[in-house]
């Protein structure tokens, strides 16, 4: 298991608060199985893997933001069709 320090992560993130938010979102993605890790898992917890990705410069807010965009237009279109039929 590679040791990750806050200082290693802060080389790629502006401040500690941003580091907390970024690592939390990424760890949640990894824990729920929605995304594959960008580093070797090595039997670590999702939080450690997220921090290792940040420390290696593989993770950024742009990456998280692009991953969170969901195309929801068809869902709303179906809902609107159902509500129009009920009227």
From Swiss-Prot:
PANTHER family: DNA-DIRECTED RNA POLYMERASE SUBUNIT OMEGA (PTHR34476:SF1). One of its GO terms (molecular function) is DNA binding. It catalyses: RNA(n) + a ribonucleoside 5'-triphosphate = RNA(n+1) + diphosphate. This is DNA-directed RNA polymerase subunit omega. SMART domains: RNA_pol_Rpb6. It comes from Pseudomonas fluorescens (strain SBW25). SUPFAM superfamilies: RPB6/omega subunit-like (SSF63562). Its EC number is 2.7.7.6. The RNAP catalytic core consists of 2 alpha, 1 beta, 1 beta' and 1 omega subunit. When a sigma factor is associated with the core the holoenzyme is formed, which can initiate transcription. One of its GO terms (cellular component) is DNA-directed RNA polymerase complex. InterPro entries: DNA-dir_RNA_pol_omega, Pol_omega/Rpo6/RPB6, RPB6/omega-like_sf. Keywords: DNA-directed RNA polymerase, Nucleotidyltransferase, Transcription, Transferase. GO terms for biological process: DNA-templated transcription. Belongs to the RNA polymerase subunit omega family. Promotes RNA polymerase assembly. Latches the N- and C-terminal regions of the beta' subunit thereby facilitating its interaction with the beta and alpha subunits. It comes from the Bacteria. HAMAP family: RNApol_bact_RpoZ (MF_00366). It is an enzyme of class 2 (transferase). Pfam families: RNA_pol_Rpb6 (PF01192). Gene3D superfamilies: 3.90.940.10. Transmembrane segments: none annotated.
